[in-house]
Amino acid sequence: MKKNLIIGIICYVITGVLTILFLATSVSVKLIMPELEKVIVLCVASIFTYFGGRFLTKYHNSKKYMKISIWVMFILYLLLLINFIVLGNNFGRNFEFIFTASKDTIKSYFDNNYNIIPFNTIKNYLDNSGIYFDIKLVCINLLGNLLCFMPFAFFLKYLFKRENKFINFLLTIVLIVIFFELIQLLTLSGSFDVDDIILNTLGAILFYLFISLKGIDKLLKNIFFLEKNKINGKD
């Protein structure tokens, strides 16, 4: 039915509009949007992307549109991650600093914004929470680092067959996390912290193991790839 085609296209158009809004508020100094609202915008965009894929799948009788939708969601997630890690002013990021800082300032920044001692930052947070650090901010920081790379588990597992082997996924996610940590340091928008690498990687691993459970795996394939797997109590 043409109705499915029209609705599918409308969903994708709405996704495009919301993505443009997100990008505009991320790079413009005049258009400012709180980080939570940016998350909501891209979550809504992802929902429209999903249903766009479903309606186009019904119209064309081809599941490839669902995979396209998952790829679009992956791109939206990457945009959100880049915003938080490099561009997010609400998180103390100052990407423009790299263009105005002197060589001495840059050298000093590199010298003072890295930690290669495992659990040093985490221990510092826990020991000084409520004294030098707000407990709420400590929880947000630690929990945020644990959660923010979890979606990679889903996207890597279901978009790349190679990542269905745990050892391949582990190597990939470690490299990705290290890459983002280096980007923060090299753009002067954050620090390189081995504790962030530990938390980011741990979160992704835990979620990967969770979605690899037989019943959860079948459920996700039914939802996102429109498979018709039977799920029983033993799964």
Segments from the language model and where they lie:
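Active-site scaffold segments
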Residues: 181-184, 196, 200
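Bulky hydrophobic segments
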Residues: 1-188, 208-235
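Alpha-helical transmembrane segments of multi-pass membrane proteins
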Residues: 146, 150, 197-204
